[in-house]
């Protein structure tokens, strides 16, 4: 089991969770952050740090957020648009930096005007 970042993060990316993660497993896409399920140690430090309440324990995902369980994993295991290989488990987000692209699910979410 792992923690999952849901749709509340899209176009917000508060990033307070990134600072709390002891294993640096929260990666930055273009519009959303993603938790690498293979690197997450399930400590839960990220959840209370998230100011927009976008982080869920896998077993507590609301029905309207279930698609993000697979989508968080897809960010690391599938070839993202514009890339030639899956990101995989690089061993920490800081060394990789912002990825600059999102999964097709997140990219398809309409941008809300302020």
Curated annotation (Swiss-Prot):
> Molecular function (GO) terms listed?
3 iron, 4 sulfur cluster binding; 4 iron, 4 sulfur cluster binding; electron transfer activity; metal ion binding
Query: Do you know which Gene3D superfamilies this protein is assigned to?
Result: 3.30.70.20
So where does [4Fe-4S] cluster get bound? 21, 40, 43, 46
Q: Does the entry feature the keyword Iron-sulfur, yes or no?
A: yes
Entry's InterPro entries?
A: 4Fe4S_Fe-S-bd, 7Fe_ferredoxin, FdxA_Actino, RnfB_subfamily
Q: Name one GO cellular component term.
A: cytosol
For binding [3Fe-4S] cluster, which residues are annotated in this chain's numbering? 9, 17, 50
4Fe-4S ferredoxin-type domain residues: 31-60
Any one of the GO BP annotations: response to hypoxia
Cofactor binding comment, as recorded: Binds 1 [4Fe-4S] cluster.
Q: Which UniProt keywords apply?
A: 3Fe-4S, 4Fe-4S, Electron transport, Iron, Iron-sulfur, Metal-binding, Repeat, Transport
* PROSITE patterns attached to this UniProt entry: 4FE4S_FER_2
Q: Which cofactor does it need?
A: [4Fe-4S] cluster; [3Fe-4S] cluster
This entry's comment on induction and repression of expression is: A member of the dormancy regulon. Induced in response to reduced oxygen tension (hypoxia), low levels of nitric oxide (NO) and carbon monoxide (CO). It is hoped that this regulon will give insight into the latent, or dormant phase of infection. Induced in C57BL/6 mouse lungs 3 weeks after low dose aerosol infection with H37Rv bacteria.
What would be one Pfam family of this protein?
Fer4
Checking SUPFAM superfamilies in the record gives: 4Fe-4S ferredoxins
> What role does this protein play?
Ferredoxins are iron-sulfur proteins that transfer electrons in a wide variety of metabolic reactions.
Q: Which NCBIfam families match?
A: FdxA_Actino
Q: What is this protein called?
A: Ferredoxin
- Organism listed in the record: Mycobacterium tuberculosis (strain ATCC 25618 / H37Rv)
């Amino acid at each position: 089991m792992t923690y999952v970042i849901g749709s509340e993060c899209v176009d917000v990316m508060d990033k307070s969770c990134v600072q709390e993660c002891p294993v640096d497993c929260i990666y930055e896409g273009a519009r959303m952050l993603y938790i690498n399920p293979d690197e997450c140690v399930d400590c839960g430090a990220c959840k209370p740090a998230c100011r927009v309440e976008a982080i869920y324990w896998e077993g507590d995902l609301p029905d309207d957020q279930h698609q993000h369980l697979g989508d968080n994993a897809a960010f690391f295991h599938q070839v993202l648009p514009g890339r030639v290989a899956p990101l995989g488990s690089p061993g920490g987000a800081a060394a990789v930096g912002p990825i600059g692209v999102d999964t097709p699910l997140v990219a398809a979410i309409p941008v809300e005007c302020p």
